[in-house]
Design a protein with these regions (language model features):
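Generic N-terminal amphipathic, Lys/Arg-enriched alpha-helix
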Residues: 3-33
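Short amphipathic alpha-helical segments, especially helix-boundary/capping motifs
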Residues: 3-5, 17-21, 43-46, 86-88, ...
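A short alpha-helix capping/helix-coil boundary motif
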Residues: 21-23, 45-50, 89-92, 109-110
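A short, well-structured juxtamembrane/interface segment
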Residues: 32-49
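Short, contiguous, pocket-lining structural segments
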Residues: 16, 39-42, 60, 170
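Glycine-rich phosphate-binding loops that contact phosphosugars or nucleotide phosphates
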Residues: 54-58, 64-169
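Extended alpha-helical regions
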Residues: 1-7, 164-171
Length: 171
């Protein structure tokens, strides 16, 4: 087929591929090295203490958040994706984990506010800790990886587009 010839011209050579994946690995090493271990410990303590966990995110960060929710369920936690129709209401003892790379997504701010009114605790995982959303939470985990529309100068730059580094680092 004609499209096969087009595909052959766009194939990345092996050396270029190796250079790219080594660069991506170095980016992740830099993010891990820059993370505040006390924030990680605080986030883990919130997760361990929660009776039930609710997870929210939007766009590609939301896809990563759903994967994170599934992994928490595999660890034995009762976990709900906040957008599901069958999600129960939150109450004291519950935890809402909001993934918000840019730190300023209005509907996530609204949901954090509502969760706080129920007595649930709130954890925000973000690449922009000085923005509005992280300030709404009891605990904030700064992932210093480049995010889409991020402004924090401490984030690790990436050769990858948009917020790929942040989204990958969520795993």
């Amino acid at each position: 087929p004609a499209w096969l010839g087009e595909m052959d011209r766009s194939v990345i050579d092996v050396k270029e591929y190796e250079d790219l994946y080594h660069q991506i690995l170095r980016e992740h090493e830099s993010v891990f090295a820059a993370q505040d271990q006390t924030q990680i410990e605080a986030a883990l303590a919130e997760i361990a203490a929660a009776v039930r966990i609710f997870v929210i995110g939007a766009g590609r960060e939301g896809i990563a958040a759903r994967s994170f929710a599934m992994r928490l369920m595999h660890l034995g936690k009762e976990v709900h994706w906040l957008w599901d129709d069958t999600t129960p209401g939150m109450t004291t003892g519950d935890l809402l984990i909001a993934i918000n790379g840019s730190g300023c997504i209005g509907h996530i701010d609204y949901l954090l506010d509502q969760a706080g009114k129920t007595g649930a605790r709130r954890l925000v995982i973000t690449g922009a800790p000085a923005e509005r959303t992280p300030s709404e939470a009891e605990v904030s985990l700064f992932v210093p990886a480049m995010v889409y529309k991020g402004t924090d100068p401490r984030t690790i730059p990436s050769k990858q587009p948009m917020g790929n580094l942040f989204e990958q680092h969520l795993f």
